[in-house]
Amino acid sequence: MSVDAATVRRIAHLARIAVTDDEVPHLQGELNAMLAFVEQLAEVDVDGVEPMTSVTPMQMKKRADGVNDGEIADHVVANAPATEDHFFLVPKVVE
């Protein structure tokens, strides 16, 4: 799979990132390198390899489960084109 300049611009638009025309070729190369690496990973034979979540045994620290909005709701939705009550508004796609 190869990423072209139009795809770079579309990804930037969807991510709400400003990208100049001078940056597009560099980003195109970076994205193509990432995709090439992922394709290499897909070729690795993992038959018989036991799934793991970490290379070292770890115990997660437990804490009380309390509700906390983080007081950053306004910052989270600041770049969204449409919001209501700290929620993202998206176009209806299913009738």
From Swiss-Prot:
NCBIfam families (alphabetical): gatC
Function: Allows the formation of correctly charged Asn-tRNA(Asn) or Gln-tRNA(Gln) through the transamidation of misacylated Asp-tRNA(Asn) or Glu-tRNA(Gln) in organisms which lack either or both of asparaginyl-tRNA or glutaminyl-tRNA synthetases. The reaction takes place in the presence of glutamine and ATP through an activated phospho-Asp-tRNA(Asn) or phospho-Glu-tRNA(Gln).
Gene: gatC
Homology family: Belongs to the GatC family.
Keyword Protein biosynthesis: yes
Keyword Ligase: yes
PANTHER family, per the entry: GLUTAMYL-TRNA(GLN) AMIDOTRANSFERASE SUBUNIT C, MITOCHONDRIAL
Annotated catalysed reactions: L-glutamyl-tRNA(Gln) + L-glutamine + ATP + H2O = L-glutaminyl-tRNA(Gln) + L-glutamate + ADP + phosphate + H(+); L-aspartyl-tRNA(Asn) + L-glutamine + ATP + H2O = L-asparaginyl-tRNA(Asn) + L-glutamate + ADP + phosphate + 2 H(+)
Enzyme class, broadest EC rank: ligase
GO MF annotations in UniProt: asparaginyl-tRNA synthase (glutamine-hydrolyzing) activity; ATP binding; glutaminyl-tRNA synthase (glutamine-hydrolyzing) activity
Enzyme Commission (EC) number: 6.3.5.-
Biological processes, Gene Ontology terms: glutaminyl-tRNAGln biosynthesis via transamidation; regulation of translational fidelity; translation
Protein source organism: Rhodopseudomonas palustris (strain BisB5)
UniProtKB keywords: ATP-binding, Ligase, Nucleotide-binding, Protein biosynthesis
Listed Pfam families: GatC (PF02686)
Protein known as: Aspartyl/glutamyl-tRNA(Asn/Gln) amidotransferase subunit C
Family annotation (SUPFAM superfamilies): Glu-tRNAGln amidotransferase C subunit
Subunit structure, interactors included: Heterotrimer of A, B and C subunits.
